[in-house]
Regions:
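His/Asp/Glu-enriched short active-site or ligand-binding loop at hydrolase and phosphoryl-transfer sites
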Residues: 60, 184-208, 257
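A short, structured surface patch at a secondary-structure boundary
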Residues: 35-87, 91-97, 102, 196-199
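Basic- and aromatic-lined ligand-binding clefts that recognize polyanionic substrates
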Residues: 29, 34-50, 142-194
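C-terminal segment of classical bacterial N-terminal signal peptides
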Residues: 17-25
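Bacterial N-terminal signal peptides that target proteins for export
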Residues: 2-11
Length: 285
């Protein structure tokens, strides 16, 4: 389950438009497409935030925000070239993590359809890079730059207000088999910004280690964040786990269910997630 929700991907955001090479994409990836298909929930949110919403003709089956986006049954995970081509787009935003993404990209290029290949960012700077690249690719560079500037200021204000004076141990739960996200990941960086001490950092797992119940109990986190709340996990289910009642976060009811989807996307609502984390942990020392 968690694999469809977690932040994952190579260390560098690489944006490719049409046949442009990675070395020159930043300079050449510009244009003013009028028929955009977004096969990425994060990209969909970014497009609307930078003023490109009117150019979007279709979005994938997971792009549920904003509600005004033209929702379809196009799959972001298993894209179908024929289904995409039927919309006659002039730009398709494709996730590099999609099944057979490289082949899909080449097949679309053969049909003279430009492709923006999106690689999941590992930190907020890489997310901002996607904002700017999408702005350039869609003809809205100024709006994208302004949005990034505003977001940076808002996040800085939130972190300044809520950052912990002393490191506070936390556990981010991706699913009930105890996969987590360490500080090398996108969401892990957000926790680091608040001076949280991520207990997953002690494990090995390429950014997303699987912890044992014993290691979580021993680490005794003061806060537990549940990314699997929509899948049935709650304060009650966590408290019912053998031995977990001894954990500080459980004893003090500092188990926080994260909002659906926002933690797993790197669009403009990143600011909302920072604010949520700051406000819900403000009184926890």
């Amino acid at each position: 389950m968690f694999k469809s929700r977690k932040w994952a991907g190579p260390a560098t955001v690489v944006m490719l438009l049409s046949t442009i090479s990675a070395a020159t994409s930043a300079e050449a990836a510009s244009g003013n497409p009028t028929k955009i298909i977004s096969l990425s929930p994060s990209a969909t949110e970014i497009l609307y935030a930078i003023g490109a919403g009117s150019q979007v003709i279709a979005v994938d089956d997971n792009s549920d925000f904003p509600k005004t986006a033209p929702f379809t049954n196009l799959s972001s995970f298993t894209p179908n070239v024929e289904a995409i081509a039927a919309y006659r787009p002039d730009l398709v935003i494709l996730q590099s993590s999609a099944t057979n993404a490289a082949t899909i990209k080449q097949d679309l290029l053969k049909l003279k359809i430009n492709v923006f290949l999106e690689v999941t960012p590992n930190n907020i700077s890489e997310a901002y890079a996607e904002f700017l690249a999408l702005g350039k690719a869609t003809g809205h560079p100024s709006r994208a730059k302004a949005l990034v500037t505003t977001m940076k200021a808002q996040i800085s204000e939130i972190v300044t207000k809520y950052r912990k004076k002393n490191p506070t141990p936390i556990f981010h739960e991706l699913d009930n088999t105890l996969y987590s996200a360490d500080s090398s990941t996108f969401i892990g960086q957000i926790y680091s910004d608040f001076n949280f001490a991520n207990i997953a950092d002690a494990a090995n797992g390429g950014g997303y280690p699987q912890l044992s119940a014993e290691s979580v109990i021993k680490a005794n986190p003061k806060i537990i964040f549940l990314d699997d709340g929509p899948y049935g996990e709650s304060v009650a289910t966590v408290a019912a786990r053998p031995g977990w009642s001894a954990i500080s976060a459980v004893k003090n009811r500092h188990v926080i269910v994260l909002p659906l989807d926002i933690p797993d996307r790197w669009g403009p609502r990143i600011v909302d997630f920072y604010r949520f984390i700051g406000q819900t942990t403000a009184k926890i020392n």
